[in-house]
Swiss-Prot record:
GO biological process, one term: translation
Name by which UniProt lists this protein: Large ribosomal subunit protein uL24
HAMAP family tied to this protein: Ribosomal_uL24_B (MF_01326_B)
Family affiliation: Belongs to the universal ribosomal protein uL24 family.
CDD domains from the UniProt entry: KOW_RPL26 (cd06089)
SUPFAM superfamilies reported in the protein's UniProt record: Translation proteins SH3-like domain
Pfam families given in the database record: KOW, ribosomal_L24
Gene3D superfamilies: 2.30.30.30
UniProt subunit comment: Part of the 50S ribosomal subunit.
Cellular component annotations (GO), alphabetically ordered: ribonucleoprotein complex; ribosome
One GO MF term: structural constituent of ribosome
Origin superkingdom: Bacteria
Keywords, in A-Z order: Ribonucleoprotein, Ribosomal protein, RNA-binding, rRNA-binding
Amino acid sequence: MAKLRKGDNVIVIAGKDKGKQGTVLAVKNDRIKVEGINIVTKHQKPNAATGAEGGIVKQEAFLHISNVAIFNAQTQKADRITYQFDDEGNKKRVYRSNGEVVATA
């Protein structure tokens, strides 16, 4: 199970886009799509049924979730996530470095 969720602010820790930050657009299994990261060129075929035009399109591609880490805005560094239960018994995501609750999008 991925600890990162759609809307989280992450930083790339490995690969060609190392050091760049972005917002998570999608999480599928062990892959993640981040806004403005891992841009690839796709040669799109025209489709009359959907009205999509053909041509060369640049879009974000999925990258492995191990290549990104959540960005802690308080420490301005990459961080990890752990889970803790609050007083009511609700499960919360917290930063490992300082124990603050991760803001949900």
